[in-house]
Amino acid sequence: GIEEILIITGKNKKSIEDHFDKSVELELELEQKGKTELLEIVRDISQMVNIYYIRQKEPKGLGDAIYCARSFIGDEPFAVMLGDDIVDNDVPCLKQLMSAYEEYRTTILGVQTVAPEDANKYGIINARYIEDNVYKVKDLVEKPEPGKQPSNIAILGRYIITPEIFEILENQAPGKGGEV
């Protein structure tokens, strides 16, 4: 399971660190009001995982943010979860991805189908069908021109990535907008 969380932040994002920090004030207030059950829940949450932060010096894209984590990650596979996608499912998305990783032992992307007319709003995969909910990705197309998308299967902001990505990112030239 996941025991450590690394959050890549940028300039003026101190509130993210504050949000996930231990809340001494809240614990004190709950204790003073005799709300011991809630106090235990709050304390248990703060002990669930260790959270670390690395600041991305410039906003140079997702690839650069992932590359910032290389010394923290080492040589283990890792999960990437982008905060701008909310996934609500009976089986949590990350659990599904971890199960797929255990079976295939390779980088896993979370995907979803989108209406063809909305494909230009997403990164879209060009892939070969393997079995239900499993595709072998040939290519990724970021926000394709309307009508030119290879499929209507969009990349969700959830990934399990192998550490080989760091070698690829190290040699990756910046793309559109200077992003990696």
Task: Give names to the regions the model predicted.
Residues E3-E4, E76:
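Short acidic/polar active-site loop segments enriched in Thr and Asp
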Residues E4-T9, G110-V111:
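Short internal beta-strands
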Residues I8-T9, I54, G157:
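Small/polar loops that bind or transfer phosphate-bearing groups
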Residues T9-K13, L26-L30:
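Membrane helical hairpin/interfacial module
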Residues K11, M81, N89, I160-I161:
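A conserved hydrophobic position in a structured secondary element of the catalytic/binding core
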Residues E17-V24:
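Glycine-rich loop at the start of a catalytic domain that most often binds anionic cofactors/ligands
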Residues L26-E29, T36-Y129, E170:
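Conserved beta-loop-beta/alpha segment of the NTase-like Rossmann-fold superfamily
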Residues A79, M98-E102, Y129-V180:
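Catalytic-core segments of class I nucleotidyltransferases/pyrophosphorylases
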